[in-house]
Amino acid sequence: MTPLHGKTALVTGSTDGVGRLVAKRLAEAGFHVYVHGRDRKRGQEVVAEIRSKGGAADFQPADLSALAEVKGLARAVLDGTDRLDLLINNAGIGSGGTAGVRQTSRDGYELRFAVNYLSGFALTRLLLDQ
């Protein structure tokens, strides 16, 4: 058993890429991992992969461009565990897509600002306040 066995982590943006790899590595090290993303199918695939190798994981969906969903994610994680030992704010969106067209979140913020900055700050504060 490692010193990390039984610890709990939330990795945002962990249904693909770096976040997925980090979630899998944390589970291998003994963490119970909350996998996060927007796509339920991909989230469940990551959870199934972790569990198939003896790890512990759950999926929590949320669209981080909406502050209400950020709050819901924090609430779901806090309701599911006694403590959160590690938060990795990995989720983000790039600059691809509709060039020159202003995109805003449901809350009226610039989309990339909402996802890449506000959501991480808000999620951290919500989890720290508990």
Residue ranges and their predicted role:
Residues Q103-F121:
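Catalytic Tyr-X3-Lys loop
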Residues A29-E45:
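Conserved glycine-rich Rossmann-like NAD(P)H-binding loop of the short-chain dehydrogenase/reductase
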Residues I93, D129:
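Alpha-helical segment proximal to the catalytic Tyr-Lys
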Residues T124-R125:
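A short, exposed helix-loop element centered on a Lys and neighboring polar residues
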Residues L10, Y34, D58-Q60, F113:
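Conserved Rossmann-like nucleotide-binding pocket used by diverse enzymes
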Residues R40, Q60-R75:
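The beta1-alpha1 cofactor-binding region of Rossmann-like NAD(H)/NADP(H)-dependent oxidoreductases
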